[in-house]
């Protein structure tokens, strides 16, 4: 939805009276902000004690305004762009009168408020710009274009990290017309690109890059590059690219800005060119993360936690794979027993009954049945990962394989989870959690399936499973494995 949420600053910190829980688990707190169609409240999950922000949307107003399609698109976009520098959508709920967006609560407020106090130091501005570019690049790789980037839509968490918010004006790649361009006029005047003003068609990726350039200028200068009391005069300056960098801007920064605020979108920097720029690269680290149990997990944080215990082993492990170094070394008590599948699980695994695609955008996957021990299956997955230089993460009977190469849609990430079918049979479900679909299919066909086909369990005879929902050809009479096709194959 394209409305502006106004922050409330004068409301009391505590609620004057207790309220009923929203859908049984959220305790509503103070009003954080409001717009034409929605109000945003601070809330607390009474089960986890976690603070969240809940956007409460008036259904009647949305219906009258014809904005249902906007709501659906915003939900779809927020589900698609899960990144440490993007405000996360946890869940969506609805009643007869209201729609609730349960979102990450970002405590630090708008970046705009920080810039309003004066220009930032170069290293601070660079950090925010790096995080902004990381987030926007991630969005574009998934076919999402923000189209309203500005400091008011950039929030800061308690650790001073940037979070991109407000995807109400965002577009997705399937909205592109036959000419390969977008045609909707949107955005905030001071941050809008010249080609949008021309009202001809525009490349939304290049429009976001222009906005990032304006934001960088504002962070470093403390004021807008294109400013005039008269809006039409400001538009003329934008269209002509008329701006001056202050004397305290370094030569490197000035050159970068000239490429970001290039009026010709064909000559404007692309994201790969930005990330190769010398000013941008200072102190930059690629953000590595993965999604587990519906939560974002930072790879760097895991490494730091393990660095003390691993430090003394570095010399002796120099010849070992990097996979072993990154993998958690907690192996007390052996592997737990896999979760057992009930009849409903087995039915959902059968072709035509798998509903996971309704909830998971990256639902591509395969399943196979094996009579081999869980430890042997996990070892085989680790072996495959080692050959292709993938990082391995293990938790109980789940294994995550993460590629090091930054593909078109980020690094390829594959999750494998093992379930108990019978005392001597397990089902292994393999899914793509991130990265390009073609790259995933190549990996499965050339690496995963050929190597797993040879997997056997010593001295184990698999017993038949009398469940009609499972394809008979998928139940082996020997310890060898057999792939069950998923609904995406």
Curated annotation (Swiss-Prot):
Its cofactor is Mn(2+). Residues 166-195 are annotated as: Activation loop. Gene3D superfamilies: Kinase associated domain 1, KA1, Transferase(Phosphotransferase) domain 1. Residues 336-360 form the NAF domain. Expressed in roots and shoots. The active site is at 148 (proton acceptor). Its EC number is 2.7.11.1. It is an enzyme of class 2 (transferase). Residues 26-280 form the Protein kinase domain. GO terms for molecular function: ATP binding; protein serine kinase activity; protein serine/threonine kinase activity. ATP binds at residues 32-40, 55. The keyword ATP-binding applies. Keywords: ATP-binding, Kinase, Manganese, Nucleotide-binding, Phosphoprotein, Serine/threonine-protein kinase, Transferase. Induction: Repressed in roots by salt stress. Residues 363-392 are annotated as: PPI. The modification Phosphothreonine is found at residue 184. It catalyses: L-seryl-[protein] + ATP = O-phospho-L-seryl-[protein] + ADP + H(+); L-threonyl-[protein] + ATP = O-phospho-L-threonyl-[protein] + ADP + H(+). It comes from the Eukaryota. The activation loop within the kinase domain is the target of phosphorylation/activation by upstream protein kinases. The PPI motif mediates the interaction with the ABI (abscisic acid-insensitive) phosphatases. Belongs to the protein kinase superfamily. CAMK Ser/Thr protein kinase family. SNF1 subfamily. Interacts with CBL2 and CBL3. CIPK serine-threonine protein kinases interact with CBL proteins. Binding of a CBL protein to the regulatory NAF domain of CIPK protein lead to the activation of the kinase in a calcium-dependent manner. This is CBL-interacting serine/threonine-protein kinase 12. The lineage of its organism: Eukaryota, Viridiplantae, Streptophyta, Embryophyta, Tracheophyta. The gene is CIPK12.
